Amino acid sequence: FSAAEKLHDDGYKFVLDLVGFFEDEYKERVELLESKGVVKFHGFQEEPRPYYATADCVVMPSYHEGMSNVNLEASATGRPVITTDIPGCRESVENEYTGWLCEPKSVNSLYEKMKAFLETDISKREVMGKYARQKMVDEFDKKIVVNDTVKALKL
């Protein structure tokens, strides 16, 4: 949350919609950021598609994610993604092409990537979203993944 708070303090106008769970240790911080207009907490949602549909970008930093469904879903809906340069996340995002990769555990790196997004013009954001969608079709379609898995396992 520190990167978002710093951007807000630096005068950038945005609201992060928080969808899903977070640890209890963040409760007070989220409530404070919500009162400042930095975030809006929605909790767990059975149907996340409406949130992707209204998002300009999806921010999903992680220390240990594996293959992130959030990144895949966001990209499939044509949204640029800001995520961490770790195994699993880096496979779904091409840095500065379909989104941005930040350094793990680096508030400054996440800040810089979020700032880069906010300073990117809308037409370029839309192009990045289209590239993200196409990457999902070309590399992560279920038939492709199953065929690649069968080949890898030599079944």
Report the location of each language-model feature.
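A short, well-ordered alpha-helix in the C-terminal region of glycosyltransferases
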Residues: A116, S123-E139, V145-K151
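Short glycine/serine-rich donor-binding loops of glycosyltransferases
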Residues: S68-N71, C89
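Short hydrophobic beta-strand element within catalytic cores of glycosyltransferases
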Residues: P80-T83, V93
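A short hydrophobic beta-strand element within the catalytic core of glycosyltransferases
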Residues: V58-V59, A74
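Conserved acidic donor-binding segment of nucleotide-sugar-dependent glycosyltransferases
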Residues: N95-E96, W100-V107, A116-I122
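Aromatic "clamp/platform" in nucleotide-sugar-dependent glycosyltransferases that forms part
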Residues: F44, Y63
